[in-house]
Amino acid sequence: VVSLVGRPNTGKSALFNRLAKKKVAIVFDQPGVTRDRVTRTVSLGDRQVMLVDTGGIAFDKRVTKDPLDDETRSQAALAVEDSTVCVIVVDAREGIAPLDAEVIRRVRESGCSCIIAANKCDTVDDDWRAHEFERFGLKVVAISAEHGRGMEELVSETVSRIPVADKEEEDSKKPLRVAIV
């Protein structure tokens, strides 16, 4: 399982749609559009993975004042708990927000393998904005979910963190075939 997490309006759903190669998640330029987890089995490189889009995580009730935020946080926490890899999506144009730091801290504490996808780096000239996020000590990939920039590197980095199931484990998941002759 690979989950996309982050604060509201960083482009998680746009990235989900880009990786799914289909418009599955609703994308709208307003916080709080995604509330429940959206899942889809997708091909990343040579792997089939369950990709999960989560709602934007907000922790401060004084700021959000939305009763659904607790449920959105809960859904995101479940996604992180179930994940092998968490892609933390940040808005590189806005730089590091306190909420980004809090999301990164909490996801790292989960023990999940983490990558930061610095979104909204629409051109090569924007990539410098992604470097600010390197201070968290995680792999940072400059991307543009809207334009498809950086997807190869993000997919490669993600796939490299997914353990390869051994042959015996794969065989045990296959249905048993029986023939009576």
For each of these PLM feature ranges, what is it?
Residues 1-82, 132, 163-181:
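Conserved G1/Walker A P-loop phosphate-binding module
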Residues 16, 26, 50-53, 87-89, ...:
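Short, conserved beta-strand segments within well-ordered enzyme catalytic domains
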Residues 32-33, 56-58, 93-95, 120-125, ...:
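Conserved nucleotide-binding/hydrolysis micro-motifs of P-loop NTPases
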Residues 45-46, 90-95, 156-160:
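Noncatalytic linker/hinge segments flanking ATPase motor cores
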Residues 71-139:
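Conserved C-terminal guanine-recognition region of P-loop GTPase G domains, centered on the G4
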Residues 113-115, 120-171, 177:
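Canonical P-loop GTPase G-domain recognition
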